[in-house]
């Protein structure tokens, strides 16, 4: 049966391609704004996020996020996670001895360590149900293709696809498709793109608006002059025909924001799962 948008039937295969899109990498960011960890599989949390993704967040005395947008020092903070043992090891880019913490019982000690690192008092919040997404209207994982990361890295001398993955901090990386294939996962304003990843239902919402963080070196925090301008210019020049250009009030956008319906809670995403586009519908056609 065709999907519907604005009363007009849109063939389900209108957005399908000959490519076989599969999940190549799943990256979780257990503490918002800190380093990620790659996993082979993850479950869907009750609030529609990936389990463990941004389940913790560091906030200041005004209860505002301590993140890379506000504090470049975040980029110097290294975090290594072992989700099986609920542990994180923190270090100041090798300048101090690494310190290990249990995420299930050492939060006060970790708050003290981070307060010393930042030079002001911080608190660690926890929300295992929904996490702390930047976009609360599209709180699912962000999606990008490996080919996109490779193409974008070529726009910046000396950069690699891994550099771009660290800068853009996406959750799901897709292989087997061309650059900017993920732009098929959103439609015109007021629409959603239904797609499946394995057995998990997704809704593609919009192209992800980027902040200052990708313009900074992911380890030093030093801002790269002209990064935002170059990315926006090249995105506009290379925007594929299948992308809904009306969603770009500016072109400093990369990757796709998604939602996962409540019905999918508890299901599992795995590396190797196929991504299948089902069709486009109006956002209010539930």
What are these regions (language model features)?
Residues 2-286:
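Metal-cofactor-dependent catalytic cores
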